[in-house]
Swiss-Prot record:
Listed InterPro entries: KOW, Rib_uL2_dom2, Ribosomal_uL24, Ribosomal_uL24_CS, Ribosomal_uL24_KOW, Translation_prot_SH3-like_sf
Organism phylogeny: Bacteria, Pseudomonadati, Pseudomonadota, Betaproteobacteria, Burkholderiales
Key words, A-Z: Ribonucleoprotein, Ribosomal protein, RNA-binding, rRNA-binding
Gene Ontology CC entries for this record: ribonucleoprotein complex; ribosome
Name of the protein described by the UniProt record: Large ribosomal subunit protein uL24
Gene name, Swiss-Prot/TrEMBL: rplX
UniProt record similarity statement: Belongs to the universal ribosomal protein uL24 family.
Provenance organism: Polaromonas sp. (strain JS666 / ATCC BAA-500)
GO molecular function: rRNA binding; structural constituent of ribosome
Keyword rRNA-binding found: yes
Subunit text: Part of the 50S ribosomal subunit.
Known function: One of two assembly initiator proteins, it binds directly to the 5'-end of the 23S rRNA, where it nucleates assembly of the 50S subunit.
One of the protein's GO biological processes: translation
């Protein structure tokens, strides 16, 4: 079970974007996530008339390692850790470590 999923609001805890918040839009693999507006890089693209693209400099979000982000707890307004709790019916749910509240599925 992944502790950070698509649709979660996360806060960057390390790197040049430290302190910024965003929403996970994609899990690249088991260890990287793509967060909207975080880790922006400038890509230089050539014009391609066959595809209808113009050349220039494009800003694009790149994946960031999941160890550099933490889930954002709206109740406390801070970053929080994620724990896994086993319910009586055998289902696993994600919970905030600080409060024990269940994390709503996005």
């Amino acid at each position: 079970m992944n502790k950070i999923r698509k649709g979660d609001e996360v806060i960057v805890i390390a790197g040049r974007d430290k302190g910024k918040r965003g929403t996970v839009s994609l899990r690249k693999d088991d260890s990287h996530v793509l967060v909207d507006g975080i880790n922006l890089v400038k890509k230089h693209t050539k014009p391609n008339p066959l595809k209808g693209t113009t050349g220039g400099i494009v800003e694009k979000s790149m994946p960031i390692h999941q160890s550099n982000v933490a889930i954002f707890n709206a109740a406390t307004g801070k970053a929080d850790r994620v724990g896994i709790k086993l319910l009586a019916d055998g289902k696993k749910v994600r919970v905030f470590k600080s409060s024990g509240d269940e994390i709503k599925a996005a």
